[in-house]
Amino acid sequence: MNLGSINENDFKESKAVAIAKNIIEENRCFKTFCEMDKRPNLDGHMSFIYKNQERMIIEVQIKTLPQNYCLSKSRVSKYYYDCDTKVFNVVKENVSLNPVSLILVDTYNKKVFCILLTRQYVAELHVNGKTTKRIYFNDSDEFNND
């Protein structure tokens, strides 16, 4: 019988989601993230609050960074991640009318990086039929009050 199961990746995801929740809430945003979800492509959403009112909802996909995500000799980007292309296709195919963000979590250093996936950003990735795509990011993508 084909029944869903809990695997090692579910435990890694749970840790990443917990870190993301804490850091995002410290920055005065509400979030609804799902752990061990089987909803394809997205893990939940963040609500940005301004003057005690919800002003924007952003759909999110959360990924755990590997321990070795630093680039050693790059002038342009400091970090990289080989990402499943499903979240990029969500943007490309207009699956959600809300903006979509990729949340990358460094569980070792407890850092959260946030990349807004605009249609232009996704188009420039040239995902086409690929199942993974390497993306690059920097310290400026770290989630903070700015």
Model region roles, listed by residue range:
Residues 1-40, 46-146:
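Mixed-charge (Asp/Glu-Lys/Arg
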